[in-house]
C-alpha cells in the first residue's frame, strides 16, 4: 500500500466552533491525504453559527480538497421534512452549504430528527439534488486512493434504539423498519469486507 490514511477530517459543531476561534490556516497536515468531511446535526435553519461553519468548511475545502461529505444525520431539525419540496431543503441545506467547494457528493444517513418527518422524502431528494446521494436507509460504498482501499458503511441507527421504536406518534417510521434485516446485512458486509480501511458511520 502506497499510503496510510493517517487522519480523517471530522467536523462537528463543537469541533468547528473551537476551530473557528483558533483560526488555524495551516492545512498542510492534510496534504496528499484522502480527506472528507464528517458532519453531524447540521440542520439548524441557519441558526447556531450554521452559516459561518458552512463557510469555514468551504474555505478549508479550497486548501484540502475534500472528496465528499459524510452527513451523519439530522440535516433537518427539529421535525424533519414533509416532502422533497419542503422549504427546509433550502434553509437547512442548499442556501447554507452553497460554497463552490461544497458542491461535491454528499452521502447522508437518517438521524432521529428526520424520523419525526417524512423519511422517504430524504431518500427521494437524491432525485432532486445532484450532490445528495442516498441510495437506501443503509448502504456501503468503496473508495480507492493511491493503492489504499476504503469501505464506508452507512447504518440507520434510529430504528435500532428501543426508545424511538416505542414512540410511534413521534417517530412513526422507526417501528416500521426491519432491524434484524439491517443487522444481518451489516454482519454480512463486515464479514466479506477486504478493504484496508473499514469505517462504519451512524447517527448515534
Language-model-detected regions and their locations in the chain:
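N-terminal active-site segment of His-dependent metallophosphoesterases
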Residues: 20-87, 175-176, 180
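Extended active-site neighborhood of metal-dependent phosphoesterases/phosphodiesterases
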Residues: 28, 35, 77-198
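Bacterial N-terminal signal peptides
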Residues: 9-18
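Bacterial N-terminal signal peptides that target proteins for export
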Residues: 1-9
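Active-site glycine-centered loops adjacent to acidic/histidine catalytic or metal-binding residues
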Residues: 41, 73-74, 111-112, 155, ...
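Generic beta-sheet signal
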Residues: 69, 196-202
Amino acid at each position: 500500500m502506497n499510503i496510510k490514511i493517517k487522519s480523517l477530517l471530522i467536523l462537528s459543531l463543537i469541533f468547528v466552533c473551537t476551530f473557528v476561534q483558533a483560526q488555524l490556516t495551516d492545512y498542510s497536515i492534510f496534504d496528499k491525504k484522502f480527506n472528507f468531511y464528517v458532519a453531524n446535526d447540521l440542520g439548524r435553519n441557519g441558526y447556531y453559527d450554521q452559516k459561518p461553519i458552512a463557510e469555514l468548511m468551504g474555505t478549508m475545502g479550497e486548501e484540502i480538497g475534500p472528496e465528499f461529505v459524510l452527513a451523519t444525520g439530522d440535516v433537518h431539525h427539529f421535525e424533519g421534512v414533509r416532502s422533497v419540496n419542503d422549504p427546509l431543503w433550502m434553509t437547512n441545506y442548499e442556501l447554507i452549504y452553497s460554497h463552490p467547494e461544497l458542491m461535491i457528493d454528499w452521502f447522508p444517513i437518517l438521524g432521529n430528527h428526520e424520523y419525526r418527518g417524512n423519511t422517504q422524502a430524504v431518500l427521494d431528494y437524491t432525485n432532486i439534488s445532484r450532490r445528495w446521494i442516498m441510495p437506501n436507509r443503509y448502504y456501503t460504498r468503496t473508495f480507492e486512493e493511491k493503492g489504499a482501499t476504503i469501505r464506508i458503511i452507512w447504518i440507520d441507527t434510529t430504528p435500532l434504539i428501543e426508545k424511538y421504536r416505542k414512540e410511534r406518534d413521534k417517530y412513526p417510521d422507526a417501528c416500521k423498519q426491519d432491524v434484524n434485516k439491517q443487522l444481518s446485512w451489516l454482519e454480512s458486509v463486515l464479514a466479506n469486507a477486504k478493504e484496508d480501511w473499514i469505517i462504519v458511520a451512524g447517527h448515534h
